[in-house]
Amino acid sequence: MNSAEAFAAIALAAVACDGSLGRDEAHALRAQLEYRSLYSSSSEADMGDLFDQLLHRLRDQGVNWLVDEALPVLTLPQQQSALAVAAHLAHADRTVTEEESAFLESLSKQMALPEGEAASILVAIEALNRDSLDA
């Protein structure tokens, strides 16, 4: 697995961890990846092939396996970004399920981030996605 596959794997795991891949989540996943330098030279067909391959692995091996394979490939800055994107994607459908919360917690613990950094990233992304009109 290369870094482009690994980063996409974490993002896909985030949207699939609750057992469903909704339309809002799929659109958010695509939007989060398409402007990043890792994917900027990828064609529609390349991206389709990448996700077909990752979805096959996800179905065969599960979310945890996908994350376990992806994390060691990512550098520390890539892990930071992957966690932020995963958290943002969990909020894409405006509801964070228990499964998504548990996934983000587990992902945070598996990353080699400095003490407290993962929690700070999650809090920041939650604040970013909060509807300020809600109490």
Predicted segments with their positions:
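Small-residue-enriched hydrophobic alpha-helices in membranes
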Residues: 1-135
